[in-house]
Amino acid sequence: MPQLESVKKIWGHAPHNAFTDLIRFRERWWCVFREAEGHDLPGGTVRVLTSETGVVWESAATLVEGGIDLRDPKLSVTPDGRLMLVMGGCIYDEDGEYLIRAPRVSFSEDGHAWSAPRRVLSEDHWLWRVTWHDGRAYSLSKLGEGDEPRRGFLYSSVDGIEWDWIAEFKLDGVSETTLRFLPDGEMVALVRPGYIGTSRPPYREWSFCETADRIGGPNFIRLPDGSLWGSGRLFTADGPRTVLARMTTSSYEPVLTLPSGGDTSYAGMVWHDDLLWMSYYSSHEGGTNVYLAKVRL
């Protein structure tokens, strides 16, 4: 069974620090998340942290776009060796009511200097996480909010700016999605609120199964031994928790609960030095803070 080796708070300066991601780039750690006054309040900005060892963290950059609430930043490395950020960009009226959104992307050569957030796709889209494979970026865009029907469109891109439609995920309540690839080219999708999908090139036809548990903020990775490990928010008898799950292409089994509670989830996952490193956010210690956990599998 997985064992929690360590966990520590690495950031808590804003009233609400949430929606994390984690990556290794140029032999350093990089962690991103949203800073704001609250979970659903406008005015979010994106903070980029960096660390050489994962022990001491420092701020590398802050991304801001006037009048836009930047949300759910996710990191990837482009084929030409740059860091890429994909974010949701939401607009609110003067009373703070949600109006519309569109995805934003930003790029950096060094993690410190970033291009201005650039809008991609059309209004109502939200590219939630980008995964690169064989020189192309893939992402599922979620559409629809509130009482509107939700839809999920799979896109690909060669540059992260111009996106080509591939297929629609016709699932009830389809939302946040992480995509990964197996060595034979099969694509696997972990989809909120609780689906696992598989497809082979050209990724137009999909097979889905439902998971036993509902998943919020889904992420997963494939380890060198071929095993799949997932994470997300699990609603337990004691309230929401961030969990690590043993995963296959047809199952998702929570096996470890991280120290967490309340407003929590959205883990970044990296396999490094024979440990699973996980960034996540939680409000179990007062305030909503960013944490880094190391898990031995």
Where do the language-model regions lie?
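Beta-rich carbohydrate-recognition and catalytic domains
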Residues: M1-A18, I23-L70, V77-S265, V270-L297
